[in-house]
Amino acid sequence: KDDMTELRITLREADLVIYSSPLYIFNVTGIMKNFLDRLLPNMKPYMLIKDGQTMHPHRYEDDKEQGFVVFSASGFPEVEHNFDGLTSSFRCFSSHMENTSLMGEFFLPAAEVMAHPVYKKRKDKISEICQTAGKQIVNEGKIDIDLMSALTDTEITNTTFQSQADNFWKTLDGKKSYLKEVPKL
């Protein structure tokens, strides 16, 4: 027994849900996927065709319409192709779930460089964008597409990113991190 029953109740009562997960193998983490799978009891087992789409009807008819936002960060510097699996999953989630609507997608590429002090301005800009988006969704019920796009600007070239990432892995800290996670065969 765990707290999933309580989490489903909390989720049902929320006006807005923010799903946030680092990008792992082009999708959400295993823990997030398990959580999403365990939301299935919030739907009835029957079939419903709505707007040409077959879905399960929502179990709780008194639940209100609910919006959700997706946030994910990746070590790779490009949004294109890297977030496709995650995007597809949540767009299907939105189209197959009654009373839910995807209100925004925030993808943060090249997140691993955020820890470097030289990228403090970028980190501050991202924080400001997220705060503005939060205010927009509460006050206006939507997020400006330009705001979502602004988050994806890494402000560095892919070549610079690659060089910095590779240099980290060549350092003693990088080697220790890598070797600690790799099993000996």
Where are these regions (language model features)?
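Short linear capping/connector segments at secondary-structure termini
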Residues: K1-D2, A111
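Helix-loop-strand module that forms the ligand-binding subsite of alpha/beta enzymes
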Residues: D2-C92, H96
